[in-house]
Swiss-Prot record:
Domain FAD-binding FR-type: 224-491
Protein name: NADPH-dependent diflavin oxidoreductase 1
Catalytic activity line of the entry: 2 oxidized [2Fe-2S]-[protein] + NADPH = 2 reduced [2Fe-2S]-[protein] + NADP(+) + H(+)
Positions annotated to bind NADP(+): S538, R539
Subcellular location(s) per record: Cytoplasm; Mitochondrion
Functional description taken from the UniProt entry: NADPH-dependent reductase which is a central component of the cytosolic iron-sulfur (Fe-S) protein assembly (CIA) machinery. Transfers electrons from NADPH via its FAD and FMN prosthetic groups to the [2Fe-2S] cluster of DRE2, another key component of the CIA machinery. In turn, this reduced cluster provides electrons for assembly of cytosolic iron-sulfur cluster proteins. Positively controls H(2)O(2)-induced cell death.
Enzymatic class: oxidoreductase
One GO CC term, this protein: mitochondrion
GO biological process per UniProt: cellular response to oxidative stress; iron-sulfur cluster assembly; nitric oxide biosynthetic process; positive regulation of nitric oxide biosynthetic process
Family: Belongs to the NADPH-dependent diflavin oxidoreductase NDOR1 family. In the N-terminal section; belongs to the flavodoxin family.
Cofactor(s) the protein requires to work: FAD; FMN
Binding of FAD, residues: R383, R413, Y414, Y415, S416, G445, I446, C447, T448, W623
Length: 623
């Protein structure tokens, strides 16, 4: 695939949705012979912006209306990221007036700061620096309750395809022809059977070409900010009879470096696949076995996606599958877009060519069907993995050299720190993801399964992420901490940091004797006067009479808490699972402001809450 600095596709992605849609757009442009630059916003070289004429951005939002981490991720030797360059105050207001741009935001209206990520980019790039819009910014909503798909009942993919259609329509009308060998010819779409070869792919290394690396010892190169930790404690803190396994997980730096972190900061953990799953994948693609342990290198440089967390050495197919390839994830559209042409092995088909054609057609349908219902029913509903898809479609014979193009890269996972500043151990509180699907198959989260398997003394790769959630001016302000379940994790760090002498902690779980995590410590803090503790148990009425959820306790304490918020500038910190809980807490908080805060109506109460969010006095960290 050729690249050009004139047309640029950038993405900011936290969970992979924006990356996947940007990949599809890039794929479509290449098939129409539009050379372009394609990378994350953080990987884009600011110096190239003066050569850019058409800028297409797809970006999600994370945390408190923040841009995804790969927008600010600084890699290589560049002194600044593209975004940090754009934020410089001395830039002229017409800096980007040579650019025509189109933006797509992906968001979830259940979060207070819906699509703030793309709005920040739009405000700076278009409003303040003069870029021209090809068409109005599109905003997709996971809930279909706001944005461009409001009230349609359609998912975010419907907004993406509207965006793609507009982008292609513009480019094809602007450039209906292209030059080939000095001749002007009509622009036509590439034959769908042709695979788009990536700029850099794998090949057998000339060095040690006849060797096989069978040792399990590996190292990771190319990421200077990567750290190594040693596991000190990994114990279950929910009862054995409870369905949810929650771990107290402690580790320390192997070089005994004292880590510097604050309440609200997170740890980035780099997981890997199991050896059993890697063997399963190789058994499915049995033609890989012969070279699975031979040394490999790249034809043209290491892809940027592999630099975060370091590249495994020795670099073999087996090690890449274990440490970098996320083949146990649910496949996205771009996976099918790239692999359907490899359904070629008729020798495995009981019905011969007819069955092969059926498999090819179905895979292609998953790649191109815009309503995506079949893809959702086949992959998302049963949480079917890429490996299971390959085990279903046995005609697919994948070329190993493109493995890092069609398989997604394992993304690191982020966990809130539970320990207090200065603790030599970094402590996490981790809910192990394990459940059964409609297929009655057990599913496990790749990172929590990795953590659950770790033994004391084993090593992990990690980084620290400073989020600066709790501001210095909040020191000694009253704090209301609300955290059901493992939402308690970052709140523990707040209490341990002793940044306030007036803390109310509202904790919720199902049962007092099953999943009341850190019960002894919380009650000890209560006895010593460090916190006012209010615990609710949703399935245990005997121990929680009249109070089922954290929002019930919030309402019961409404007058007292509202007084602290309105008259004493208290900070409200909400943590836990996204979905109904944060919405219900927010609605309860608004009702409290109306009843006890002297706000006459809903609008004035909401306005006050917005001001709290703006000044970071109402903090919502949900996942």
């Amino acid at each position: 695939m050729s690249s050009s600095k004139k047309i640029v596709i950038l993405y900011g992605s936290e969970t992979g949705n924006a990356h996947d849609f940007a990949t599809i757009l890039s794929h479509r442009l290449h098939r129409w012979h539009f050379s372009h630059t394609f990378c994350s916003i953080g990987d884009y070289d600011p110096q190239d912006i003066l050569k850019c004429r058409y800028l297409f951005i797809i970006c999600s939002t994370t945390g408190q209306g923040e841009l995804p981490r790969n927008v600010n991720a600084l890699k290589g030797e560049r002194p600044v990221t593209f975004w940090s360059f754009l934020k410089r105050k001395n830039l002229p207001s017409n800096l980007l007036n040579h650019i025509q741009t189109a933006m797509l935001g992906l968001g979830d209206s259940s979060y207070p700061k819906f699509n703030y990520g793309i709005r920040k980019l739009h405000q700076r790039i278009v409003t303040q620096l003069g870029a021209n819009e090809l068409f109005d910014r599109l905003e997709a909503d996971d809930q279909a309750m706001a944005g461009s798909n409001k009230g349609t009942g359609l998912g975010i993919e419907s907004v993406y395809f509207e965006y793609e259609k507009k982008v292609l329509s513009f480019l094809l009308s602007k450039y209906p022809n292209r030059k080939v060998n000095g001749q002007i010819i009509k622009r036509e779409e590439l034959d769908p059977e042709v695979y788009l070869e990536p700029a850099s792919y794998l090949q057998l290394s000339d060095e040690h070409a006849n060797e096989k690396f069978t040792s399990t010892k590996v190292i990771f190169e190319g990421d200077e900010s990567l750290k190594v930790g040693r596991v000190n404690i990994n114990k279950r803190i929910t009862s054995e009879g409870h369905f949810q396994d929650v771990r107290q997980f402690k580790f320390s730096n192997v070089d005994k470096i004292q880590e510097n972190y604050e309440p609200g900061d997170t740890v980035t953990i780099y997981p890997c696949n199991t050896d059993e799953d890697v063997s399963r994948f190789l058994a499915n693609q049995s033609h890989w076995l012969e070279i699975a342990d031979k040394p490999l290198n790249f034809t043209s440089g290491v892809p940027n996606d592999l630099k975060d967390g370091g590249l495994v050495r020795p670099m073999t197919l087996r090690n890449l599958l274990k440490y970098h390839c996320d083949f146990m994830s649910i496949p996205r559209t771009s996976f099918f877009l790239k692999i359907w042409t490899f359904a070629t092995d008729v020798t495995k088909m009981e019905r011969g060519q007819e069955q092969l054609n059926d498999q090819r057609e179905k895979l292609r349908q998953f790649a191109t069907d815009q309503d995506m219902q079949d893809l959702y029913d086949y992959c998302n509903r049963p949480r079917r993995s890429i490996l299971e898809v390959l085990e279903d479609f046995i005609s697919v014979k994948l070329p190993w050299k493109y493995v890092l193009d069609y398989l997604p890269i394992i993304k690191p996972r982020y966990y809130s720190i539970s320990s207090g500043p200065g603790d030599p151990n970094i402590e996490l509180t981790v809910a192990i993801v394990k459940y059964k699907t409609i297929l009655r198959k057990i599913r496990r989260g790749i990172c929590t399964n990795y953590i659950a398997r770790l033994q004391e003394g084993e090593q992990i790769r990690y980084k620290l992420q400073n989020n600066h959630i709790i501001k210095k001016e909040f020191l000694n302000k009253p704090m209301i901490l609300v955290g059901p379940g493992v939402g308690l994790a970052p709140l523990l760090s707040v209490v341990k940091a002793e940044i306030s002498k007036d803390i109310k902690l509202l904790f919720g779980c199902r049962y007092k004797d099953k999943d009341y995590i850190y019960k002894d410590m919380l009650e000890d803090w209560f006895r010593k006067g460090k916190i006012a503790l209010h615990s609710s148990f949703s399935r245990d009425e005997e121990n929680s009479p009249g109070v089922k959820y954290v929002q019930d306790y919030l309402w019961r304490l409404g007058e007292e808490i509202t007084n602290l918020v309105v008259n004493k500038d208290a900070v409200f910190f909400l943590c836990g699972s996204s979905g109904k809980m944060p919405i219900q807490v927010r609605l309860t908080f608004i009702e409290m402001l109306k009843k006890w805060g002297n706000f006459s109506d809903e609008e004035t109460a909401k306005k006050y809450l917005k001001e709290m969010e703006k000044s970071d006095r109402y903090i919502q960290e949900t996942w």
